[in-house]
Amino acid sequence: MFEQRVNSDVLTVSTVNSQAQVTQKPLRDSVKQALKNYFAQLNGQDVSDLYELVLAEVEQPLLDMVMQYTRGNQTRAALMMGINRGTLRKKLKKYGMN
């Protein structure tokens, strides 16, 4: 079970382990662990477009949740994300979310 919270300008992820203990860690730690797992599975193979892969994994759910939070209001969503509305529209189109 995952839950994201804003705490002192740091996104955190809460996890519940098998002993029903809740722990929180910064989202960046989860990204770091996911990348470690990804690299371990590569077995020395070259990879390209890693930046795009990671960005897409984070950007799409970010856009989805912000659009839900703002009830589809693109102006509010763009302000919330700190990007201009045209950029937001381009990103929404990229992920088929328009």
Curated annotation (Swiss-Prot):
One example GO MF annotation: sequence-specific DNA binding
Assigned protein family: Belongs to the transcriptional regulatory Fis family.
Known function: Activates ribosomal RNA transcription. Plays a direct role in upstream activation of rRNA promoters.
Key words of the record: Activator, DNA-binding, Transcription, Transcription regulation
Organism annotation: Pectobacterium atrosepticum (strain SCRI 1043 / ATCC BAA-672) (Erwinia carotovora subsp. atroseptica)
Cross-referenced InterPro entries: Fis_DNA-bd, Homeodomain-like_sf, HTH_Fis, Trans_regulatory_Fis
DNA-binding region: 74-93
Keyword Translocase: no
UniProt name for this protein: DNA-binding protein Fis
Record Gene3D superfamilies: Homeodomain-like (1.10.10.60)
Any Pfam family matching the protein: HTH_8
Subunit structure: Homodimer.
UniProt xrefs under HAMAP family: DNA_binding_Fis (MF_00166)
